[in-house]
Amino acid sequence: MNSIYAFANQNIIRVQLTDVKAPYTINIKGPYKAYNYKYESEIISALTNETVMVVENRLGLKVNEVGVYKEGIVFETQDGFTLNGIEYYGSLMFIPYNDTMIVVNELNIEDYVKGVLPHEMSPDWPMEALKAQAVAARTYAMYHILKNANKLPFDVDNTTKYQVYNGKEKMNWSVEQAVDRTRYEIAVYKGKVIATYFSALCGGHTDSAENVFGVAVPYLGGVACPYCNAQIKPWTNALSYNELNNDLANYSVHATEKSSIGISTDPKSGKATNIKIDNNDITSRDFRTTLSPRLVPSLNFTIKKVDNGIIITGKGSGHGVGMCQWGAYGMAQVKKDYKEILKFYYNGVDIVDYNRVNKEFEPDVWGN
């Protein structure tokens, strides 16, 4: 298979469940079969609900105290399953990867989006904001399906590295409606599936991919966002010079009360682009990630020297690229629909129904 998934597979996603640990208790609804992941030879076939225990040891996996399967196992279900108390759509796979056994949930992308949406946006928010988030989540998933095709035994994991996903947990009517009303819709730029980044609160202006990721991307150039203003609350954090020097040791920083500390900002967004401490230059994104997003929640900040350290003051939360979620909330409050919201934050994109477009999509890969 080449780097483009066949059209028929574009709506299937493989999610690594990073937080699920052995032993595994699997409650399967309805008919299912289990087979060897590598050789596809059948292990179990059942027509009724069943509880299966999977135990991992140094030799492989044991199913209901029978056999040892070092090549991995697939539980193919019709009606989903419960794994260690969490309910999921789709099928379950145990796959040997990098000298360990990883757990992967394979399911339809529409069901995946239903599992993502309530963890990335409050289900109580306006429907148009939820619909915009559903399209962004679906597009982001599709982007990684295409990007990782035939490279890894999974497309995404269930953490903030990609999108938070926890099966059917927190599922409700609003979530189902937002996903169903935007079924199959994704955002594309010049026909390619985009990386629909989003963050909580931009602080008045979304940031550019160039500033945050080091690559200029036409649809992630940053826009003034008046729609989140009501939610902006300044934050302040302090660090001693010792703490600052320890955190930035890899950058040879030795700051004291006599040091010069300056910030370069983007003229469009006003957000920090570079930090200069004496003769040491640090990009704002490296400064933020090294000190931790807890101390530097966004790139919209200033630094003030005090006698024993620095005070960092800013506004906003998250990397700031792409859709501002509180901005989407504000736009929905003033009757903007989900397509208007998406096109506001992702400049120049089209919203298309991937199930109606008879083509093989490609991801718009730009080095991320």
UniProtKB/Swiss-Prot annotation:
GO cellular component assignments: outer membrane-bounded periplasmic space
Highest rank taxon of the organism: Bacteria
Function: Might be involved in sporulation.
PANTHER family: AMIDASE ENHANCER (PTHR30032:SF4), N-ACETYLMURAMOYL-L-ALANINE AMIDASE-RELATED (PTHR30032)
InterPro entries, per the entry: Bact_Sporulation_Assoc, SpoIID/LytB, SpoIID/LytB_N
Protein's name in the database: Uncharacterized protein BHWA1_00569
Biological process annotations from GO: sporulation resulting in formation of a cellular spore
Applications reported: Has shown promise in a 4-component vaccine with BHWA1_00430 (AC C0QY54), SecA (AC C0QZS7) and FlaAL (AC C0QWY9).
Pfam family, one: SpoIID
